[in-house]
Amino acid sequence: MDSIHGHYHIQLSNYSAGENLQSATLTEGVIGAHRVKVETALSHSNRQKKLSATIKHNQSSRSMLDRKLTSDGKVNQRSSFTFSMIMYRMIHFVLSTRVPAVRESVANYGGNINFKFAQTKGAFLHQIIKHSDTARGACEALCAHWIRSHAQGQSLFDQLYVGGRKGKFQIDTLYSIKQLQIDGCKADVDQDEVTLDWLKKNGISERMIERHCLLPTVDVTGTTGSEGPDQLLNAILDTHGIGYGYKKIYLSGQMSGHTIAAYVNENSGVTFFDPNFGEFHFSDKEQFSKWFTNSFWENSMYHYPLGVGQSFSVFTFDSKEV
């Protein structure tokens, strides 16, 4: 009996052990499946948190303004969040990688950096990314304000920043820049006309040269692409025999457009402003020409037709303050 009992006991023990092993395996499978579900849920949760953080970053209410309201009681413009804001932030990031190369090249051609500014990064990007009409950039409005400030013998950056140093923005100037860009982006308007009207109200008008008893403007349009920037450069430097002039330069390509500006003076040289890189000065036109053709055009990536390297329009302006 003992041996029999012993025999059955062993069988029963083995059966019990097998059952326990099967049970343990099933339990482990359930736990493993549960772990996968938990890890998947956590991964999804982390993605949601990252997206939420990105949205909050884009819509952050962190104040960088000298005060909450403009002089006439208006608040800093913002719109509802859109996923395009994230896309534009990525594009700005790519462009911002070109800033060091462009700035470092200025001194190599005898130029000086008057002010380091870039709408593609930092505090200014944080401000324009808050509104869908300025998220892609505010280059047109920035150039218009730069021309006005320069014509008045002032610096745009003294007007934009408290104390003329990067940090807090003066809301009146920031609001004005953003609003001009927003006005020019409306579906039923021509942005060039909006800018021209704004400049005219600020004492700056398009140059007109008398030809055959007519007074046409001296706007110039042309192509870059495979031709390179020579035609564009000639249009920028041409002062039409007057010796000076403000230039608003629009560059366009297959997928985007960009505005830059310049003040050209036969005696004092060229002051150049690109909202993506800052304000630079060259004491003579020859220095500027070499820099623009041999360095800037490629370092900025503006030579790519897919970007803004296909065609251009150059507007010339006169000012009462000149």
Swiss-Prot record:
Lineage: superkingdom: Bacteria
Subcellular location, record wording: Secreted
Recorded GO MF terms: cysteine-type endopeptidase activity
Gene Ontology annotations for the cellular component aspect, listed alphabetically: extracellular region
Keywords of the record: Hydrolase, Plasmid, Protease, Secreted, Thiol protease, Virulence
Enzyme class: hydrolase
Primary localisation category: secreted
Keyword Iron-sulfur: no
Transmembrane region(s): none
The keyword Protease is assigned to this record: yes
Annotated catalytic residues: 139, 258, 274
Family: Belongs to the peptidase C58 family.
Role: Cysteine protease, which is translocated into infected cells and plays a central role in pathogenesis by cleaving the C-terminus end of the human small GTPase RhoA/ARHA, a regulator of cytoskeleton. Once cleaved, ARHA loses its lipid modification, and is released from the cell membrane, leading to the subsequent disruption of actin cytoskeleton of the host cell.
Quaternary context: Interacts with human ARHA.
The protein's name in its UniProt record: Cysteine protease yopT1
Organism the protein comes from: Yersinia enterocolitica
Gene: yopT1
